[in-house]
A protein has these predicted regions:
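N-terminal G-site helix/loop of the GST-like fold
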Residues: 16-40
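Anionic-ligand binding patches
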Residues: 5, 13-18, 31, 53-136
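Short glycine-rich, polar/acidic loop-and-turn segments at beta strand-coil junctions
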Residues: 23, 43, 82-84
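Short glycine-rich, Thr/Ser-proximal phosphate-binding strand/loop in the N-terminal lobe
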Residues: 34-51, 127-131
Length: 136
């Protein structure tokens, strides 16, 4: 947090946050924390590159979302991406209820991994963090 002095007073200036995500869950999470932010929908190609691992994929997509054009008063950009992998295959987002049922059937009783990458970008720095969880 930065501070400014004005006529003998210190004014705290909060960095303005932009959430680069179309996820309603991520938006709701920030709202529940009382954080002020704006939302942009990062219009990027989320296709998996040939031979790309799940970890490399979520880190790349998260970083690309953070690199999206943002409002001028943005000090910090927050972006994230999550994917599920099973036996080295990246499972995409189901497009309908049938796809979702097929995916759940494929995952049922098997250990699979959920990878989430979070990218935080400021004017001077960019950091991407990764969390992988094994789920059965």
């Amino acid at each position: 947090m930065a501070s400014k002095r004005s006529a003998g007073q210190t004014i705290i200036v909060q960095p303005f946050l932009t959430l680069a995500s179309s996820s309603p869950r991520r938006k709701a999470l920030l709202q529940s924390l009382g954080i002020k932010f704006c939302v942009i929908n990062p219009n990027i190609d989320e296709s998996v590159s040939q031979f790309e691992s799940a970890v490399a994929y979520v880190k790349r997509i998260s970083a690309e979302k953070a690199a999206t054009q943002t409002p001028k008063n943005t000090a910090v950009i927050l972006a994230a991406d999550t994917c599920v992998s099973l036996d080295g295959d990246i499972l995409g987002k189901p497009s309908n209820a049938r796809d979702a049922c097929e995916m759940l059937t494929r995952l049922s009783g098997k250990v699979h991994e959920v990878h989430t990458a979070v990218t935080i970008k400021s004017e001077t720095r960019i950091e991407t963090l990764l969390v992988t969880t094994a789920v059965k």
